[in-house]
Amino acid sequence: MKLLDGVDPSQLFGLPAPDIATLDDGLQVPFVQTGHEHQEVMLFVHGSLCDFRYWKPQLGPLAKQYRCVAPSLSHYWPSGVLGFGAMAGGSRQFSWDAHVDELGRFIERLGVGPVNVVGHSRGGCVAFHLAVRYPELVKSLVLADPGGAVARPGDDGRAGTVLPAPINALRAKAAELIGSGDVDAGLELFVDSVSRPGFWARSPKEFKAMAMDNANTLALQFRDPLPAYDAKAAGRVQCPTLIIDGEKSPRMFRDAVTALEGWIDGARRVTIEGASHGMNVTHAGAFNRLVAGSVVKF
């Protein structure tokens, strides 16, 4: 089913009108797809403040080789706008854990598994746990600056206990600004912290519009910290894995990449020269070549 009502075509940034997949619990998942049905499937998982539109730099070029599928996770645009963030019969809680199961059921609903999965930032963490929890659905895995802390000896597994205090304080301030109506300032604080100072001010209009559309998810996300990566979980990843970071990515992402490179059997790491956290946008050509080449190489 195509989704047309309730969405201004200009909000799609030139992407095709999204389809809707209705899962077995009634949850409706908006997604866009490019390429052809007979092509191998590549599933893209967005991160914080984003939705399927984040993958525009990939959905066009990579459609020459793959059937590219990019869903918007529940609560993210346009799900909230159209009332799709809730299951039939009740509200759906925002959580990374629910998003993992949601993606698993989404792949099963499409009947296309196993698929090649690409996840960025928070979406990288969700994609990682998708591969751990549903190994039969993931053919290969690409993690780009995966979000989440790295477990240390003595940690109890809760990500909130291992994130540095300054990061938690900054995130609380960003949520406070957004909640008080100073959305632009809150987004600037958060986005610059996960990329580089000044990144928000230099961001394209489309990225800013997308972040504004998803600003309400930030406070929900901060109340649901990502789990810390550990060797035990990483050892359960059974598929070929490519891990990408940017030369200028913040340390918290590079730390996660370094740990996962050592823990995931056979994982390959590539650093994109000159790139920071938004590598698939700012260095789309290099990113696309890596992603396309990873599937061929595997």
Segments (PLM) and residue ranges:
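Conserved alpha/beta-hydrolase catalytic His-Asp/Glu region
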Residues: 178-220
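Flexible "cap/lid" loop of the alpha/beta hydrolase fold
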Residues: 128, 132-133, 137-178
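Conserved loop-alpha-helix segment in the C-terminal half of the alpha/beta-hydrolase fold
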Residues: 60, 231-278
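Conserved HGGG/HGGXW glycine-rich cap/lid loop of the alpha/beta-hydrolase fold
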Residues: 23-89, 106
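Residue in the alpha/beta-hydrolase core beta-strand immediately N-terminal to the catalytic nucleophile
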Residues: 72, 116, 139-142
